[in-house]
């Protein structure tokens, strides 16, 4: 379980716009706060959509 999410890590869930999940695909807000973003990236919870595993994220580059 992700400490910031009510579902299993990597699973689907519904969460608010303040979602801070690290691996969860948030279907309700269509956001994905993924591991490709560096720890502490404030923009991740603001709409970062990761297309796949990467060292960089479009919102944090």
Curated annotation (Swiss-Prot):
**An example molecular function term from Gene Ontology annotations:** zinc ion binding
Q: Which InterPro entries does the UniProt record give?
A: Metalthion_dom_sf (IPR017854), Metalthion_dom_sf_vert (IPR023587), Metalthion_vert (IPR000006), Metalthion_vert_metal_BS (IPR018064)
* Residue span of region Alpha: 30-61
Residues that bind a divalent metal cation 5: 34, 36-37, 50
Q: Where is this region: Beta?
A: 1-29
The protein's matches in Pfam families, at most eight in alphabetical order, are given as: Metallothio
* Binding-site residues for a divalent metal cation 3, renumbered to this chain: 15, 19, 24, 29
Residues annotated for a divalent metal cation 1 binding in this entry: 5, 7, 21, 24
Q: Where does a divalent metal cation 6 bind?
A: 37, 41, 44, 60
Which residues of the sequence carry a binding annotation for a divalent metal cation 4?
33-34, 44, 48
Binding residues annotated for a divalent metal cation 7, in chain numbering: 50, 57, 59-60
According to the UniProt entry, the coiled-coil residues are: none
Binding-site residues, a divalent metal cation 2:
7, 13, 15, 26
PROSITE patterns, from UniProt? METALLOTHIONEIN_VRT
Record-level GO cellular component terms: cytoplasm; nucleus
Q: What's this protein's family per the entry?
A: Belongs to the metallothionein superfamily. Type 1 family.
The domain section of the record reads: Class I metallothioneins contain 2 metal-binding domains: four divalent ions are chelated within cluster A of the alpha domain and are coordinated via cysteinyl thiolate bridges to 11 cysteine ligands. Cluster B, the corresponding region within the beta domain, can ligate three divalent ions to 9 cysteines.
Q: What is this protein called?
A: Metallothionein-1
């Amino acid at each position: 379980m992700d400490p910031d999410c009510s579902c299993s890590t990597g699973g689907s869930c519904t969460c608010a716009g303040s979602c801070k999940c690290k691996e969860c695909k948030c279907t309700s807000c269509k956001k994905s706060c993924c591991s490709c973003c560096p720890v502490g990236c404030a923009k991740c919870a603001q709409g970062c959509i990761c297309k796949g595993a990467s060292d960089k994220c479009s919102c944090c580059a």
